[in-house]
Amino acid sequence: MSLLRCTTLLLVVVAIALPPCILGYSLHDGSRLDDFLTESAADRRPRRPTTAAQRRLMGLTEEQYKTVHFYLNKLKELGNQRHPEGYDKDTTKDEADKWRKRMRDDIEGELLNPEEYGRHFEGDIILFPEQAKQIYENALKTGQRRVKRKFIGSDLRRWDPTRPIVYSFDGSHTSREQRIIELALEHWHNITCLNFVRNDNANSGNRIVFTDVDGCASNVGRHPLGEEQLVSLAPECIRLGVIAHEVAHALGFWHEQSRPDRDQFVNVRWENIDKDSKGQFLKEDPDDVDNAGVPYDYGSIMHYRSKAFSRYDDLYTISTFVTDYQKTIGQRDQLSFNDIRLMNKIYCSNVCSRKLPCQRGGYTDPRRCDRCRCPDGFTGQFCEQVMPGYGAVCGGRIQVNGGWTKFSSPGYPREFKEGQECSWLLVAPHGQVVEMQFIGEFEMYCKVRHSLCMDYVEVRNSTDFANTGMRYCCYGTPSTSIRSATTDLVVLFRSFYRGGRGFEARARALPANGQWASWSPWTPCTASCGACGSRMRTRVCSHGACAGEPVENQVCNTHPCNGLCAHKKTEDGECGGFLALLRGVRCKQERTVMEPCENACCPGFSVVGGRCVR
């Protein structure tokens, strides 16, 4: 089994369970993972308490903390004013305590997405005062939050990919918890060009310090003034998927569902959102987005779940426009392929001098420039092969025709085993499409209360297999009849947590002789210049199967940006507070100035013939 595939599986691990494939996995210090996670006497010792005041405030001073929460409270008020749906000012319940208990797992008693329960921006994001002020002021003016998403845009907050990222621990984690955190860092190392080095003696310069003083929480991106930044991982956060989520914040990721194009993919149910949380769902300014051309991703580890910040247990706050994607959003098992692709586009695009002819949505691997990094389900130097089964003989390439071809989970109708994986590529003849239906009994482990798949069958039927597909789980046979957009359709069976009955399905080829209705008008472009925006249109197929997509997305407003842009500048200035009394001491200050735009095009685009092109 390849190291890449094995490390992908790592992120399904919760506090103590690890799949068998990684028991021989080695870290930089040469430790074997079976020794790596063994509890020692040190793990059973009480944690050393963290007493520094700034640790309690996650690196902020008392005054900074008050300023940030002043603007967060104003943002909360603004959200309730703009979206009064479902708000009852006469409600007298203690909703704060009830909300914190609400989404605990029925069976295992654990918080499914613990980062949502924090007291910070969007639950787990530590803002600096200037960020909080900017977010509120732009929301006040435009109804949107002016922040660069999905990836932070300021160069001051991006790490230097040519230098190792220093990290340390403040002593509040047990040695076992430290090992799990380092395993998550090792995963980021393996799938990007980024390197991490532990230095517990570092006392200056940019570095990440892991603590456990404030739930699950992190700043976004590198500290612009070259100081330490805290990533809080309390005991309930010590799961590899949650750790990867918080580390992604520290590396520059914001949350997925706040992208300005989100209304093309999900519907925010304002009437179902907790009255103190509506400010968390305002969108960003579309002219200030940096998604590096990576599309909206239902399967992103940075996406809220379906019932995030809901008033009551059974209310959806986010509904996907395509219903079959509903159980895809909110997963904290593993980084999606597009999460990894975006990180590599931002930090690693110049590592490999030659770009390989990768297939199936793959791209040149910055860790191995002679191979492609492939979407789940594919392998080979150029992603030309279907990934073989793991734990069972299953999967492969199936050529379908006009008759039904059946395939199923391992051993069906007997139960499959935990840890088994199968990948199928269903191929129809030229000019035809694949139709797939589930048949027979269906059982895959899910969190019913949270509307989230844990084990699943995923179907990718779009033109780009890099995008996360529709995930099916729980109990009862899905009634959906799925058709591919091209001659190919991908089906992934993944059992990370439990065994079960599994699934049986059938597939056949259909002539692509349906008739498309006219395209709808284009939606407004999400950005005004620089090929930074996208627009969408839809169409409906009738009288059979239609080749092609019912939805089309397009880069728009490709003319270069000009005029003035906001830039962050760091310069020496007068010190405040106690330091102002010291003669000759100068302090670094960051301020925003309007200057001619440096980047006429979004990352990944350049000016050719007066237009921004890839």
UniProtKB/Swiss-Prot annotation:
Entry GO terms, CC: extracellular region
Catalytic site positions: E246
Any one GO molecular function term: zinc ion binding
Propeptide residues per the UniProt entry: 25-150
Glycosylation sites: N190, N461
Chain residues that bind Zn(2+): H245, H249, H255
Main location: secreted
Keywords, in A-Z order: Cleavage on pair of basic residues, Disulfide bond, EGF-like domain, Glycoprotein, Hydrolase, Metal-binding, Metalloprotease, Protease, Secreted, Signal, Zinc, Zymogen
Domain of life: Eukaryota
Residue ranges constituting the Peptidase M12A domain according to the UniProt record: 150-349
Swiss-Prot/TrEMBL cofactor(s): Zn(2+)
Domain (CUB) ranges: 394-510
Gene3D superfamilies named among the record's database cross-references: Collagenase (Catalytic Domain), Spermadhesin, CUB domain, Thrombospondin type-1 (TSP1) repeat
Activity regulation, free text: Inhibited by marimastat and tripeptide hydroxamic acids. Inhibited by 1,10-phenanthroline.
Broad enzyme group: hydrolase
Cleaved signal peptide residues: 1-24
Matches recorded under SMART domains: CUB, TSP1, ZnMc
Disulfide bond positions: C193-C348, C216-C237, C352-C372, C374-C383, C394-C422, C525-C556, C529-C561, C541-C546
Cofactor annotation comment: Binds 1 zinc ion per subunit.
UniProt xrefs under Pfam families: Astacin (PF01400), CUB (PF00431), TSP_1 (PF00090)
Domain TSP type-1: 513-562
Annotated localization: Secreted
Gene Ontology terms: biological process: molting cycle, collagen and cuticulin-based cuticle; proteolysis
Boundaries of every EGF-like domain copy: 344-384
Protein task: Metalloprotease which cleaves the carboxyl terminus of procollagens to mature collagens. Probably involved in cuticular collagen maturation.
Protein name listed in UniProt: Zinc metalloproteinase dpy-31
